[in-house]
Amino acid sequence: MRIAIGCDHIVTDEKMAVSEFLKSKGYEVIDFGTYDHTRTHYPIFGKKVGEAVTSGQADLGVCICGTGVGINNAVNKVPGVRSALVRDMTTALYAKEQLNANVIGFGGKITGELLMCDIIEAFIHAEYKPSEENKKLIAKIEHLESHNAQQTDANFFTEFLEKWDRGEYHD
């Protein structure tokens, strides 16, 4: 199984720990970064993880930022992604079994590394349990997806990053 993983600069260490855990379990990890603590932007990494999952490059995705809120919102903008921000096993299993989630999101400063690893392992092994009801719910969710042709451009974030480098944006 191939698992895409991405994070922002706030949780690089946590992502590396999760990545090493997954590798130790025999999973192929596709690490989209970030790889250090240099200030960066979570939408970039959420987009990369989401695109890897929806293109078939990865089977599942894991997104981590400080609270998990930002990167999870970003990855959910990729058409075909169904990501759940979780902090507990029950929510993660519900997301996979009932909503066929293909990405899982965490707040790396909220949820500890060991718990994240346990939840991810359970998420990987959980199976979607299709029913007429949840098929209809998933179809309604998919109907809400917005397809932005610009989003598939490899340079989608270039202008934003150039403005950042010029000091036009601030934290």
Curated annotation (Swiss-Prot):
Do you know which InterPro entries this protein is assigned to?
LacB, RpiB_LacA_LacB, RpiB_LacA_LacB_sf
Known catalytic reactions? aldehydo-D-galactose 6-phosphate = keto-D-tagatose 6-phosphate
Q: Extract the SUPFAM superfamilies matched here.
A: Ribose/Galactose isomerase RpiB/AlsB
Per UniProt, what is one GO molecular function of this protein?
ribose-5-phosphate isomerase activity
EC id? 5.3.1.26
Q: According to the lineage, what is the superkingdom?
A: Bacteria
Instruction: Tell me the Gene3D superfamilies matching this sequence.
Output: Sugar-phosphate isomerase, RpiB/LacA/LacB
Per the record, the pathway is: Carbohydrate metabolism; D-galactose 6-phosphate degradation; D-tagatose 6-phosphate from D-galactose 6-phosphate: step 1/1
The record's keywords, sorted A to Z, are: Isomerase, Lactose metabolism
BP terms from Gene Ontology = D-allose catabolic process; galactose catabolic process; lactose catabolic process via tagatose-6-phosphate; pentose-phosphate shunt, non-oxidative branch
Enzyme class comes to isomerase
The UniProt family comment states: Belongs to the LacAB/RpiB family.
Assembly and oligomerization: Heteromultimeric protein consisting of LacA and LacB.
What the entry lists under PANTHER family is as follows: DNA DAMAGE-REPAIR_TOLERATION PROTEIN DRT102 (PTHR30345:SF0), RIBOSE-5-PHOSPHATE ISOMERASE B (PTHR30345)
Q: What is this protein called?
A: Galactose-6-phosphate isomerase subunit LacB
Q: Which species expresses this protein natively?
A: Streptococcus pneumoniae serotype 2 (strain D39 / NCTC 7466)
Its organism's taxonomic lineage begins at: Bacteria, Bacillati, Bacillota, Bacilli, Lactobacillales
